[in-house]
């Protein structure tokens, strides 16, 4: 199976799982302290892995680099998890490097992954089910329920519950805070987090929808969206954005107006040099909230 490259930190289930998997399989691996493009590329060139795993932020770093296709010629598949990855970014990576991207769904409380794409499923279904995080892993079970626990039917949106295969056949259903839908073929779409919904004057704003719209702008390297208390509306969305190319808040707002409802547009967009991130590569939402809490409220309302 070749050498594995582990670039997820060992404080995260992704890094721990990969290392333990390699040890169990007597498989050699390279352990990087963190993802850094030059170090990762050097490891790929030297060890020529057939499969690599990248978190979305790392995948976008590779995608928007000048790394030539020849440097990744050994790689046959990229797996991607820990945070949402847009279908557009997955397709752009495949178009640029000729490598399919297999997204997955996992959490520390599950002891690892519970759903994901196989290469066979990707070849057969990706065009019609793009954006899904795949189907339940062997031994795992997933369902969508209403708030009272009533199971919902195919394509109905509700709370995702999981029986992880890692916990054995007698495991009970674990309720997540993720909103999801599952189609008749068992493919899962994560549509947001119930505990992160922003209620703006009675209107529900899903931060992941706003983040995805911001990250669809070609100048945006990454974005994070959180709620800020508002004395009149209760709370409003605000956004922090890291750029890869020059742009302005006005340009970003115009981009959002073409994709979102007025109430979904952040009341403030802060452009920063780099998004704060957790060791696993996710945006550090607590740090983002702290940033906006320390700033005076900007009077300009982009939603108007």
Residue map of PLM features:
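Conserved AMP-binding/adenylation subdomain of ANL enzymes
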Residues: 1-3, 11-51, 65
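Gly/Ser/Thr-rich phosphate-binding loop
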Residues: 24, 49-54, 63-127, 141
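AMP-binding/adenylate-forming catalytic core of the ANL superfamily
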Residues: 52, 159-161, 172, 177-264, ...
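Active-site glycine-centered loops adjacent to acidic/histidine catalytic or metal-binding residues
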Residues: 82, 106, 134, 178, ...
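Adenylate-forming AMP-binding core of the ANL superfamily, especially NRPS adenylation
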Residues: 84, 117, 123-167, 171
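Beta-strand->loop->alpha-helix junctions that form or flank phosphate-binding loops
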Residues: 102-109, 134-136, 226-228, 270
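AMP-binding/adenylate-forming catalytic domain of the ANL superfamily
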Residues: 261-282, 300-304
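Acidic/polar alpha-helix N-cap and adjacent early helical turns
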Residues: 290-304
């Amino acid at each position: 199976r070749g050498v594995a490259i582990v670039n997820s930190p060992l404080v995260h289930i992704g890094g721990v799982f990969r290392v333990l998997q390699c040890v169990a399989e007597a498989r050699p691996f390279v352990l990087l302290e963190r993802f850094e493009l030059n170090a990762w590329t050097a490891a790929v060139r030297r060890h020529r892995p057939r499969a690599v795993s990248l978190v979305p932020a790392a995948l976008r770093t590779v995608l928007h680099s000048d790394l030539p296709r020849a440097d990744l010629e050994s790689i046959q598949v990229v797996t991607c998890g820990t945070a949402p990855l847009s279908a557009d970014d997955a397709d752009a990576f495949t178009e640029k490097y000729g490598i399919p991207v297999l997204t997955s769904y996992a959490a520390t409380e599950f002891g690892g992954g519970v759903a994901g794409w196989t290469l066979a499923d990707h070849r057969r279904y990706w065009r019609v089910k793009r954006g899904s995080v795949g189907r339940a892993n062997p031994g795992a079970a997933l369902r969508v329920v209403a708030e009272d626990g009533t199971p919902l039917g195919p394509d109905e949106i509700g709370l995702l519950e999981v029986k992880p295969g890692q916990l054995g056949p007698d495991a009970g259903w674990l309720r997540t805070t993720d909103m999801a839908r599952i189609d008749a073929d068992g493919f899962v779409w994560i549509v947001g987090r119930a505990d992160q919904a922003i209620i703006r004057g009675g209107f529900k704003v899903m931060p992941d929808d706003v983040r995805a719209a911001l990250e669809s702008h070609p100048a945006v390297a990454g974005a994070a969206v959180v709620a800020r208390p508002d004395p009149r509306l209760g709370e409003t969305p605000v956004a922090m954005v890291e750029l890869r190319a020059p742009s302005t808040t006005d340009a970003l707002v115009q981009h959002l107006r073409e994709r979102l409802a007025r109430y979904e547009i952040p009341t403030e967009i802060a452009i920063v040099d780099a998004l704060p991130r957790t060791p696993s590569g996710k945006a550090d939402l607590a740090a983002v909230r702290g940033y906006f809490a320390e700033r005076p409220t900007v009077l300009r309302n982009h939603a108007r």
